């Protein structure tokens, strides 16, 4: 990366010429100071080697892979008086996934569901030995306590990816999971997932583009129906919530602002079994009835093949579409699959204290991890509440280890870790459109408990998630967006 090498050369020159450094303007000085602290220690022969192993008189370093619910909760609670924190992730923000579907149709703006890492853990922006790196971890050297990284340069054609290494005292793998495609041909090429902000942006742009294209003179009736047929594959909470938001958008906004094509737009939800299979039976029936009333067509079937303009089901049915959203759950990522460590149903195998027992000083939390069979515990579902609770527990455990002098590499073997992690399910919620939602407060599918449906549940759903939004800034954004949508309708700008 030529520009990066040149900066390192400049930094060396500035370091050697103290008088020149003192003449730098006060505005530029703090930025160069932080850059010098990185390059002066870790540059060799014009190549950035990375962050070297910490010394005994330095704070131990925790490296967190990922910026999802698990990793961000851990970084928020970790004691930065004990540890230096380094986060490596291909995105510089956490996505508040429960509200992501609302951004696809303009109910909320994208910034309302994105929380910058520097706001969650200010140390990565302010402390000299804590960093956030916009990069992917390609490999882990467990024996030498080191990870191999490569910078993310998506959309920047002029920059080459830069490889560097980071040594760790404690490593937390919280890299999440990838969308399951079940090996179905054409899914990755033609479907849109709903896990990241850029996915929601893509859905919104394509939806609005199809609405505008269908209104162009000369477009056939058949093509209008195809362009405005929105297909959602997967009847879990994400698929159902997106279908509900989309039906609301059609009934309230499309009918007003795209009156010429309002009779052509439809939503189809395809699921192999029952929708919302983890919810109470009564709530599933209620959701089915409400979605049907909202105009959502429910189809039970298996997708066999995805083509650019249509889906082929296992029974041979051909389903044309203009927008295809794929939401069939998650599975192990290629990175997790590449790690040579014991697995639990494809996930990284962990013990009761969230450690990876086959290697020293490595922990794993969130969707990428699962309890080993030897623990006698079931693999937990890939839910935000599971990931967040694991992050909170592990931060407390690592703070305890650090206070007892076990923060550095290979120093925690004889420390009492206390009680193991225990997960208690707090219930499930899902919105289904038309100011209605489901609230299932049972601890498990077989247990008894309170279940609610309707407008009261919608109020509970909004209140609960509003309190979970990380910062006051985003809480205010969400409230303003909800109020604006209620009074003026959704934003239909295609930006």
UniProtKB/Swiss-Prot annotation:
Gene3D superfamilies to which the protein is assigned, alphabetical: 3.50.50.100
Protein EC: 1.6.5.9
Keywords noted in UniProt: FAD, Flavoprotein, Membrane, Mitochondrion, Mitochondrion inner membrane, NAD, NADP, Oxidoreductase, Peroxisome, Transit peptide
Principal location: mitochondrion
Motif (Microbody targeting signal): 486-495
Origin: domain of life: Eukaryota
Cofactor: FAD
Catalysed reactions, semicolon-separated: a quinone + NADH + H(+) = a quinol + NAD(+); a ubiquinone + NADH + H(+) = a ubiquinol + NAD(+)
Binding residue positions for NAD(+): 228-264
Molecular function, one GO term: NADH:ubiquinone reductase (non-electrogenic) activity
Binding site for FAD: 61-91
PANTHER family in UniProt: NADH DEHYDROGENASE, NADH DEHYDROGENASE-RELATED
Family, similarity comment: Belongs to the NADH dehydrogenase family.
Function: Alternative NADH-ubiquinone oxidoreductase which catalyzes the oxidation of mitochondrial NADH does not translocate protons across the inner mitochondrial membrane.
Identification of the protein by name: Internal alternative NAD(P)H-ubiquinone oxidoreductase A1, mitochondrial
Organism: Solanum tuberosum
Gene: NDA1
């Amino acid at each position: 990366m030529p520009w990066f090498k040149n900066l390192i050369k400049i930094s060396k020159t500035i370091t050697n010429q103290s008088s020149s450094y003192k003449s730098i303007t006060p505005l530029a000085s703090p930025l160069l100071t932080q850059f010098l602290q990185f390059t002066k220690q870790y540059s060799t022969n014009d190549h950035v080697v990375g962050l070297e192993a910490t010394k005994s008189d330095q704070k131990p370093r925790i490296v967190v892979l990922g910026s999802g619910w698990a990793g961000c909760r851990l970084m928020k609670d970790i004691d930065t008086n004990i540890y230096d924190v380094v986060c490596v992730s291909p995105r510089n923000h956490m996505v508040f996934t429960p509200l992501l579907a609302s951004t696809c149709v303009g109910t909320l703006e994208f910034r309302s569901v994105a929380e910058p890492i520097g706001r969650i853990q200010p140390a990565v922006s302010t402390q000299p030995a804590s960093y956030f790196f916009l990069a992917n971890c390609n490999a882990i050297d467990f024996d030498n306590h080191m990870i191999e990284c490569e910078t993310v340069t998506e959309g920047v054609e002029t920059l080459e990816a830069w490889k560097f290494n980071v040594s760790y005292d404690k490593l937390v793998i919280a890299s999440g999971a990838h969308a399951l495609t079940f090996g179905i041909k054409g899914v990755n090429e033609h479907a849109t997932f709903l896990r990241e902000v850029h996915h929601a942006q893509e859905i919104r742009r394509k939806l609005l583009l199809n609405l505008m294209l269908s209104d162009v003179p000369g477009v056939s009736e058949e093509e209008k129906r195809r362009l405005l047929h929105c297909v959602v594959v997967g009847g879990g909470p994400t698929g159902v919530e997106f279908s509900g938001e989309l039906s609301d958008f059609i009934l309230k906004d499309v009918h007003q602002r795209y009156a010429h094509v309002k009779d052509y737009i439809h939503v189809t939800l395809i699921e192999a079994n029952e929708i919302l299979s983890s919810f109470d039976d009564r709530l599933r029936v209620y959701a089915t009835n409400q979605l049907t009333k909202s105009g959502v067509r429910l189809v039970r079937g298996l997708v066999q093949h995805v083509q650019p303009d249509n889906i082929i089901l296992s029974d041979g049915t051909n389903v044309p579409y203009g927008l295809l959203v794929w939401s069939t759950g998650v599975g192990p990522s290629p990175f997790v699959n590449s790690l040579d460590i014991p697995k639990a149903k494809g996930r990284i195998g962990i013990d009761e204290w969230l450690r990876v027992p086959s290697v020293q000083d490595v922990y794993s939390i969130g969707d990428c991890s699962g309890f080993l069979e030897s623990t006698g515990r079931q693999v937990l579902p890939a839910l935000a509440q599971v990931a967040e609770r694991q992050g909170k527990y592990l931060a407390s455990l690592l703070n305890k280890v650090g206070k007892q002098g076990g923060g550095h590499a290979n120093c925690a073997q004889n420390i009492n870790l206390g009680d193991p992690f225990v997960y208690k399910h707090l219930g499930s919620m899902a919105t289904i459109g038309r100011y209605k939602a489901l609230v299932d407060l049972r601890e498990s599918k077989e247990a008894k408990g309170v279940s609610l449906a309707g407008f009261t549940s919608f109020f509970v759903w909004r209140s609960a998630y509003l309190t979970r939004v990380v910062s006051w800034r985003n809480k205010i954004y969400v409230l303003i967006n909800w109020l604006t949508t209620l009074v003026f309708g959704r934003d239909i700008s295609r930006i």
